[in-house]
């Protein structure tokens, strides 16, 4: 012990806990020799940068652990805007190599190991495989299948298979032809709405009414969660809501004009306005109860 103290006197030297050797005092007048001196590797100057020794980059270790090629084989960051479009660059940001390379350039090589963790590779590889819903990964597809039923055939969820299916396309074609000959403001949308509306009505025709009970039992057992049936298209609902906004009650002349414009029957427009008035009444009642229960609002 005395021999060691004779070789390295404590008065002229200083012990750094991050190092395994002694550094003399005059070395702190400038940057130490073990730190990189190039300006590109040090874009920012930190007050504590002289105390951090240069260690082995963590990037190479993590790439070796997960059997991915080192970051030197990837394209440089500054060449990305010239070679790829903006969308591809956005997708490439999810890759672990470019993420760590950009962090190394922004924060300097001395602090790259602080911002990089081995779990980043796992998370990027996990979330890069997007499931069927387009947002969550593939592991969450099982929850969407149980919640919404079989999403592969939404048409069969809307309409149960009926025995008069051969007559429905003929009726739909006839209504499409008549609507195209009329040439109203909502031609294509009204034809699509007419076709969707004719399909459930054809199932209740007198020819196929004998097998309705069998169809209902088969459809209920085949699919547990049935989607809500809407006989009106979005365009028709928008026009009906606009008319309801101006007047809650509609006269016969306006009703006939609306049914002609939206390719609906007079009875359908009348029933829609009745249902909409009941809905508005319920909304007002619930709103009144809510504000009476909360007097501070």
Swiss-Prot record:
Which biological process, per GO, is one annotated for this protein? male gonad development
Instruction: Specify whether Transport is a keyword of the entry.
Output: no
GO CC terms of this entry: nucleoplasm; nucleus; protein-DNA complex; transcription regulator complex
A single Gene Ontology MF term assigned here is: RNA polymerase II cis-regulatory region sequence-specific DNA binding
Query: What's in the keyword line of the UniProt record?
Result: Developmental protein, DNA-binding, Homeobox, Nucleus, Transcription, Transcription regulation
Q: Name one Pfam family in it.
A: Homeodomain
Localization (cell): Nucleus
- DNA-binding interval(s): 225-284
The UniProt record lists the keyword Nucleus: yes
Q: Which InterPro entries match?
A: DUF3528, HD, HD_metazoa, Homeobox_CS, Homeodomain-like_sf
Q: Which domain of life is it from?
A: Eukaryota
| Location of region: Disordered | 151-230
Q: What does this protein do?
A: Sequence-specific transcription factor which is part of a developmental regulatory system that provides cells with specific positional identities on the anterior-posterior axis.
Q: Which PANTHER family match?
A: HOMEOBOX PROTEIN HOX-A11, HOMEOBOX PROTEIN HOX-A11-RELATED
Q: Which family does it belong to?
A: Belongs to the Abd-B homeobox family.
Name recorded for this polypeptide? Homeobox protein Hox-A11
